[in-house]
Amino acid sequence: MQKSILSSILLLGAVCAQANNYTVTSPNGKLVMNVKCEGGKASYTVDLNGKQMLAASALGLVANYGDFSQGLTMGTLKGAPKHLTYVMDHTKKSHVEKDVYEATIGFLNAKKDSMTLYLHVSDNDVAYKYEMSRPKKDNPKSVIIYKEVSGFNFPEKTTTFLCPQITPMTGWERTKPSYEEEYTPDAQMNVKSQFGVGYTFPCLFKVGEDGWVLVSETGVSSAYPGSRLSDYEPGKGYTVAFPQKGENNGVGSEFAGIPLPGETPWRTITVGASLAPIVETTIPYDVVEPLYEASQNYKPSRYTWSWLIWQDESINYDDQVK
């Protein structure tokens, strides 16, 4: 993948600032993200075509050296319009070119430790992540993140198309969660998930007749666990949840531990009046960079797996070559 980001000389997005309140508008003016800090708590909303896609949804996290979910003071927004272009093989779109707006907002918690919120806004996508700085006191080299309060609070008329998460170390050879449970289409938000442990990314929502929203994550590396969505809670919506205790046969922690300074993965939100922007989005790639350069030009080849056809109980060579 080759990627370049160029500053645009055009007005590709707009920012409106008030005390404890920032409004970021997409390049085409149809998507609006509002970030505010009231009572020491940060939150955001997302509107599309003047219709609310996400109501006030929480921002922040709780770490071992400080609470960044409350007692916050919001600093200055620093941002600029960008023109994003890159080429990548083996994906739904080989050449991507779009206008975006990128920004950062600094926060201080009650102990005056800092957290930076990164924003990426395009015509149908919003993405955000957190950067944690090294505190001056005790100069820790890493941080344990106990939980994110990152929320997705949908209007009450919203219905869901979600894959339920399942409890760990269950199913075939105790390999679950396998992220392949059956889902109920067009379900009500207030119905608890099938196994009571939330839902698997990506998560699709229908906001009445106003549009669709896809919530997911990208930029996950070995430095941070893959996440899921919690069950729905009235007034708060869904929140980012970490792996369950007991996954991976109990090896490792269910918390995130990252070196300092360090970043979380991106939380992505794709919105559209129809499903077209959901299907066509390239946001999983727009906000990340290649981890390394491929040693060769890899080409697809043939493969086989008898279970896909027969649902057989074992896999052997003779069956695979039939």
What is the predicted role of each segment?
Residues 118, 260, 296, 315-319:
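Catalytic cores of large soluble enzymes that bind and process phosphate-bearing ligands
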Residues 1-21:
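Bacterial Sec-dependent N-terminal signal peptides
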